[in-house]
From Swiss-Prot:
Belongs to the DNA polymerase type-B family. Replicates viral genomic DNA. The replication complex is composed of six viral proteins: the DNA polymerase, processivity factor, primase, primase-associated factor, helicase, and ssDNA-binding protein. Additionally, the polymerase contains an intrinsic ribonuclease H (RNase H) activity that specifically degrades RNA/DNA heteroduplexes or duplex DNA substrates in the 5' to 3' direction. Therefore, it can catalyze the excision of the RNA primers that initiate the synthesis of Okazaki fragments at a replication fork during viral DNA replication. It comes from Gallid herpesvirus 2 (strain Chicken/Md5/ATCC VR-987). Forms a complex with the ssDNA-binding protein, the DNA polymerase processivity factor, and the alkaline exonuclease. Interacts with the helicase-primase complex composed of the primase, the helicase and the primase-associated factor; this interaction may coordinate leading and lagging strand DNA synthesis at the replication fork. This is DNA polymerase catalytic subunit. PANTHER family: DNA POLYMERASE CATALYTIC SUBUNIT (PTHR10322), DNA POLYMERASE DELTA CATALYTIC SUBUNIT (PTHR10322:SF23). It is found in: Host nucleus. GO terms for cellular component: host cell nucleus. Its EC number is 2.7.7.7, 3.1.26.4.
Length: 1220
């Protein structure tokens, strides 16, 4: 669709005016000064954010043309003028930095290489805080006028610069450029000399340079290296020396000679590790320059305070002139590492700013009810709300609303907003989508918030904005972070490869914390929509506005658009409250600081990288080096894996290489996570309802404590038995059988485990931090609590770090040994308890204070279950109060008698009633009244509220009603077959009453609370990646796509209900069958009518199918809102069966885990009802069957006729001989 040049566009303040339009190809805009159009290249001070435009692509809904005529459709064309916005009736050319000081808040004073700093601006400061870093490679030829000689020398012919971004104590934004960083890797000297024939470091440097030159045109990413400097790279680009180091793998590896190859460019390191004699093992070639700088310098941190000092030889720092700034910061400093002092102990935060934003979109195609898609030109962003907070004070400082067209916020909303936050929202209005998006990006650049949050912004908001600007408007975004060009501003979609677990968004100098991801981690809910999360976490509900209502509201004029604006701002307000409730920035920054990784990596890059960098730092201090992952280190002790294997932590996605780790080094197979050893031991449970006290002993930090106690590590694992010749078994090394393979680990006095050192230091640090919490003020206590939680998270990642064969530094033998020792410990505890506490006298000898709590009945003790790191001990004849008071002493006694430190048992809890079902499934009440459940269906997120409600009512009765509990204990004592033919104890009558109530509720025809019956399941990967597409939540996904509804993204939970098999449901299931496999995820604007246009079906109408044509349950899955809107009945048979199934899984322990008998017994409580099936009656009549009537009210002759028919029928049946 093109725009007629004579068309006018309506603006509420200046009325209709004619715009000069030209339909020329391409956009005419400039991204800054110093652009050489002839040679199509930029100089050293160029920028890639937009500063001037004289023509742009114009996309705007036609409903904005005239406030009286509501047109459908979208204008698409070219508009020749500068982009403008309207604020309070005034027009502003917002790219004109000088004239738009009051349009929105700004923290940027350098724009388009011009300084707008105050005349009295003082660049001096004492300390600065760093929150993000970026690595770049620059050339001396491009810095001649900018840098002093000492920095130029570090760039000849090229050099790596690490830019640290942060803020000073006095609130100035600063970028510190650290010169002289040389990333490096190692190669074993003897192997290198033998394979490549080098005789000295200089000769090796020549060979390295040759490989770089010859490889430039062969590697897939050759364009990154194709510069004149690269083609003429020489040996001077490399610094090679010989050092003494030890390989971290295996005991017996002593100091050996290694070549350390330093390069002036990290890109060369990556290229050489791939292409320089692949048979030579490279060590630490996957470590980037930022990590090198932080780990190689004591006191340096990726998140923390720094100050400057005079260099080792008296060198001083250099302040860059504003015209040479490469970032949007107020101050830029050149320095080297010897000019920096770190303050890792200072945990204070400067006044960082938080942006909380939300976007609203509308479809502009034929079907305006469709959900918008970013690649469709006509689907536009119509509003963006922006709330700006101070992270330190948690105060809302500014509120902006970017709106397409005139927008009048409701007066009551503005008054409430001002009374609550003491500010008014600023509304900025635009004529076209491009102007709105460009203004938003310009605001982002000029305000430069350090932190950004929103709800599902990674998967939708950022993704929509980035896709729209790059595909529809062909804009570069690399200059819209803190750096002015060649920065990162990118979205990674979740599910694009088998490792990535969630979407990513990374922008240089802008840390994104998506509260959707935080909510899914912190809360257990059936749905993670913002409304549900806000109610659960804040006790607040949002004002609902369906995206289907947005087109009509938008077209209705400024007042209705104001309602959309209120909705948009309200979403951001709720997200801001969630952010300061869960304060995710504190814990994640503590993890980043502890692990020595960037905050963005702590957020998006998984668990493996955290342990890897910590181990790298420690290994360096002990003279060890880490090889790039080799398949031999991931060899497994067995290819079998038990059902109850311990879950291993996910490892990092190769989609964006971690520390420049190559994808090939991560993926040795197509099997995803490879777990090649037997999992943690689980002692078989004695199922049933236990009303005697059950004490639970838990191992504190089981796997970390095993690693410490037994000195397990890469460095202590004996790979060559000849290294044991001078060592004594058991005294000098541990020998353990792991699934038939004999493994040996030397003791600490021979060589101390690096993993054990790490864990010991971390746990000591955590203990010290926790000791400070009670003495600290509330604000400091929260910070300390997040720090200790961060340490716990990293500690628990160590075992998984070793156990993932596709991980960064795998050692399956270590992980397998840990689980084997854990299994043996459970068995040892069980045998100890049965032997040492087996009689009343033995128990009282050990713990005489229990004598006052002994009951008259017979005493017994037994271990009824063992679950990885827990032991369940049942005591009969002992009062629970005595066990509670003595439990800690009992746990300490077992620990001291059986295990070396730091392994210890703790008395975690004592059950007074316990329903032990199967492995990893139990529920019970702890002394004190609190109920605890694990693995039980009623707490699963994909159960509906109806089932959860009644299952909870029944479980409450079982544990809180002593009459029911006594009756249930009686049931559990007898064999299941007894209850198949015998009446249940009367004490279970109230139990049956709840079941009858559930049945009665399902039989009510006017069910309106559909949400009570909604279930949910996660869309774990893209729909086309599912092998089985006939599953309920995927069926709903396809139905939403067919109806052009809003489509869930990967990792979203999809809600669904099971509908009755009405004609409409049958029809839609057939359409879904045709639709499957041919889904175009962005084909939203088809001619499909809105759901509201569907033909209504009477809710009493059902369709019967022959068995061969019977619908699957998954085919009857439906979107809850669609079901309610179209008056489709629920499938009551399914829900009753599902309720009974859930109850059977939970309460089968009462009947010896016999599911069939459990269901038979539970069905006794459901009232029998008769529902006449007309179609069945007609079918029977057609087969010559006759109808008879009986009962009160029949006439004498009719009753007599009935008796005669029955007499004949039963006589015939009696006379017919049995033929089988």
């Amino acid at each position: 669709m093109s725009v007629d040049g004579t068309k006018t566009f309506f603006n509420p303040y200046i009325g209709a005016r004619k715009r000069s339009l030209e339909a020329r190809n391409g956009l005419s805009f400039s991204t800054g000064q110093n652009y050489d159009e002839k040679n199509n290249r930029r100089d050293r001070n160029s920028i890639t954010y937009v500063t001037t435009i004289d023509e742009f692509k114009y996309i705007a809904p036609k409903c904005l043309d005239d406030k009286d005529v509501k047109q459908k459709g979208t204008h698409i064309g070219k508009l020749k003028r500068s982009p403008v916005l309207y604020k309070n009736g005034e027009e502003y050319v917002f790219l004109n930095f000088e004239d738009c000081e009051d349009v929105w808040p700004r923290r940027c004073s350098i724009w388009n290489n011009r300084s707008f700093l105050p005349a009295d601006f003082d660049p001096r400061f004492s300390r600065f805080h760093v929150y993000d870093m970026i690595e770049t490679v620059e050339f001396a030829s491009a810095a001649i006028d900018r840098d002093k000689n000492r920095f130029l020398e570090l760039l000849r012919p090229m050099g790596t610069i690490v830019t640290m971004m942060g803020i000073t104590e006095c609130g100035k934004r600063v970028a510190v450029h650290v010169y002289g960083i040389k990333p490096y890797f190692y190669m074993r000297k003897v192997d290198t000399d033998t394979i490549c024939g080098s005789r000295c470091p200089r000769e090796l440097a020549e060979k390295l340079a040759n490989v770089v030159r010859s490889s430039v045109n062969e590697v897939a990413n050759a364009k990154r290296f194709c510069t004149p400097v690269t083609r003429t790279v020489s040996a001077d680009c490399f610094e090679v020396d010989v050092v003494q180091r030890k390989d971290i793998y295996y005991y017996g590896t002593g100091h050996d000679e290694f070549y350390r190859v330093k390069s002036q460019s990290g890109k060369f390191i990556t290229l050489l590790c791939d292409n320089f004699y692949p048979s030579i093992i490279k060590y630490e070639g996957n470590i980037d320059a930022i990590t090198r700088m932080v780990l190689d310098n004591n006191g340096f941190s990726t998140f923390g305070w720094y100050s400057f000092k005079v260099g080792n030889n008296g060198e001083k720092v250099q302040v860059r002139a504003p015209c040479h700034h490469c970032t949007s910061c107020d101050i830029e400093i050149n320095c080297t590492v010897d000019n920096l002092i770190g303050y890792p102990e200072d945990d204070a935060w400067p006044d960082y700013k938080l942006l909380c934003f939300d976007i609203e979109c509308k479809s502009g195609g034929v079907n305006e009810c469709a959900f918008p898609c970013a690649t469709n030109e006509e689907d536009v962003v119509i509003q963006i709300s922006c709330l700006l907070y101070s992270i330190n004070t948690k105060q809302l400082e500014h509120a902006l609303l970017f709106a397409l067209g005139a927008c009048d916020l409701p007066q009551t909303f503005k008054e409430t907003f001002q009374s609550s936050y003491n500010i008014l929202p600023i509304v900025l209005e635009f004529d076209s989508e491009f102007e709105l998006l460009l203004a938003f990006m310009t605001f982002i650049k000029q305000y430069a918030p350090e932190f950004v949050t929103g709800y599902n912004i990674v998967n939708f908001d950022w993704a929509f904005i980035v896709t729209k600007l790059t595909t529809v408007y062909n804009m570069r975004l690399d200059g819209y972070g803190v750096v002015n060009q060649k920065g990162m501003f990118k979205v990674w979609d979740a599910g694009t490869n088998r490792f990535q677990k969630k979407g990513k968004f990374k922008a240089t100098g802008m840390i994104t914390l998506d509260m959707y991801s935080i909510a899914t981690e912190k809360l257990k809910l059936q749905s993670y929509k913002l409304d549900v999360v806000a109610e659960a976490a804040l006790g607040e509900r949002k004002k609902e506005l369906s995206y289907k209502e947005i087109p009509s509201h938008f077209a209705a004029g400024p007042e209705k658009r104001g309602i959309i604006g209120e909705y948009c701002l309200q979403d951001s307000l709720l997200v801001g409250k969630l952010f300061f409730k869960y304060i995710p920035h504190l814990e994640l920054s503590a993890i980043a600081k502890l692990a020595g990784i960037l905050l963005s990596k702590a957020i998006f890059d998984g668990q493996q990288i955290r342990v890897y960098t910590c181990l790298l730092r420690l290994a360096r201090s002990h003279g060890f080096i880490l090889p790039e992952k080799n398949k031999k280190f991931a060899e497994t002790v067995s290819l079998t894996c038990e059902e109850d294997q311990t879950e291993i932590c996910e490892h990092d996605s190769p989609q964006e290489p971690i520390h420049n780790i190559k994808q090939s080094s991560l993926c040795h197979s197509n099997s995803g996570r490879t777990i090649g050893y037997q999992g943690a031991k689980v002692l078989d449970p004695i199922s049933g309802f236990h009303v005697d006290p059950v004490m639970v002993f838990d191992f504190a930090s089981l796997y970390p404590s095993i690693i410490q106690a037994h000195n397990l590590c890469f460095t202590t694992l004996v790979h060559d038995d000849t290294n044991l010749s001078n060592l004594r078994p058991q005294d000098d090394y541990l020998e353990i059988n792991v699934q038939g393979k004999l493994l040996r680990f030397v003791k600490p006095h021979i060589r101390e485990s690096l993993l054990a050192i790490l864990l010991k230091d971390w746990l000591a640090m955590r203990k010290a931090i926790r000791a400070k919490i009670p003495e600290s003020c509330d604000e400091i206590a929260v910070l300390l609590d997040k720090q200790q939680a961060a340490i716990k998270v990293v500690c628990n990642s160590v075992y998984g770090f070793c156990g993932v064969s596709n991980g960064l530094l795998p050692c399956i033998d270590v992980a397998a040994t840990v689980t084997t020792i854990g299994r043996n410990m459970l068995l040892t505890v069980r045998d100890y308890i049965h032997k040492q506490w087996g009689t009343r006298d033995a128990l009282l000898r050990e713990f005489p204070n229990l004598s006052n709590f002994m009951r008259p009945e017979d005493y017994s003790v037994s271990v009824i279950y063992g679950d990885t790191d827990s032991v369940f001990i049942k005591f009969k004849g002992v009062d629970i109060h005595g066990l509670v008071t003595t439990g800690d002493d009992m746990a300490k006694r077992v620990s001291s008698d059986l295990f070396p430190k730091p392994i210890k048992l703790e008395c975690e809890k004592t059950f007074n009633k316990l329903l032990l079902i199967t492995k990893k499934k139990y529920m019970g009440t702890i002394h004190g009244g609190r109920m605890l459940m694990k693995g039980v269906d009623i707490v699963r997120k994909n159960n509906c509220r109806f089932i959860n409600t009644y299952a909870k009512k029944l479980s409450d009765l079982l544990f809180l009603d002593d009459t029911v509990a006594k009756a249930a204990a009686t049931v559990a004592e007898k064999p299941p077959s007894f209850w198949a033919t015998s009446p249940l104890p009367e004490g279970l009558n109230s139990f049956g009453g709840v079941l009858a109530e559930a049945y009665t509720r399902m039989m009510i025809n006017n069910i309106t609370e559909v949400e009570d019956f909604a279930m949910s399941a996660e869309l774990s990967r893209p729909p086309d990646a599912y092998t089985n597409k006939r599953i309920p939540h995927l069926t709903v996904y396809y139905k939403l796509a067919m109806r052009s509804e809003q489509l869930p993204v990967v990792k979203d939970r999809i809600s669904y209900v099971i509908a009755a098999a009405t004609p409409e449901v049958v029809r839609d299931s057939a359409r879904v069958a045709e639709f499957r496999g041919e889904l175009d995820l962005c084909h939203q604007n088809s001619n499909t009518s809105c759901p509201g246009d569907s033909v209504m079906t009477n809710k009493e109408t059902y369709v019967r199918h022959s068995p061969r044509n019977k619908l699957l349950i998954s085919d009857m899955a439906e979107d809850p809102k669609y079901l309610l809107a179209n008056n489709i009945p629920l499938n009551t048979d399914y829900y009753l069966s599902h309720l009974l199934g859930t109850l059977c899984v939970t309460f089968k322990a009462l009947f010896g885990n016999d599911v069939k008998i459990t269901e038979t017994v539970l069905r006794r409580f459901i009232p029998e009802t008769f529902t006449e099936d007309c179609s069945y009656t007609e079918r029977v009549s057609s087969e010559m069957f006759t109808t008879i009537r009986s009962g009160i009210g029949l006439q004498v002759n009719e009753e007599e006729e009935t008796r005669r028919k029955l007499n004949i029928a039963f006589r015939i049946l009696t006379a017919t001989p049995h033929r089988y």
